[in-house]
């Protein structure tokens, strides 16, 4: 690891990303700030772990955080199982190849989604229901989209903590 982070900064939509950020803070001893709080608390270019929720493989507000801070690792929290979609998320987010990326499964709470995001999930559900010969992953995803679920777990932090404590 080139630069050790000195804080965790996050943005959360339904609370799952906030919970992961706080779990990481609990395991590392790093202070944790919501993005708007961080602007008052942290100087520019502070090395941080940034955590944001995933939407269409893009980590919410990553670019905003990267303009202000030195993002030394990125955690994207979304629907996909932990450790999946790394290539897609890196590309959609515009994350440099040398920056460690971790995806963490958060879950789904349709009622907690605001604005256009709920409508987008409804559209995704309708699209997936029309799919002929869905895979097991498709079926599991559709079930989660419809029924909801919470998968935030300390167990999902293995790769993040391994990276943090390396060297």
Language model segments and positions:
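N-terminal beta1-alpha1-beta2 submodule of the flavodoxin-like/Rossmannoid cofactor-binding fold
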Residues: 1-68, 158, 162-167
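FMN-binding flavodoxin-like domain, especially the glycine-rich phosphate-binding loop
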Residues: 54-167
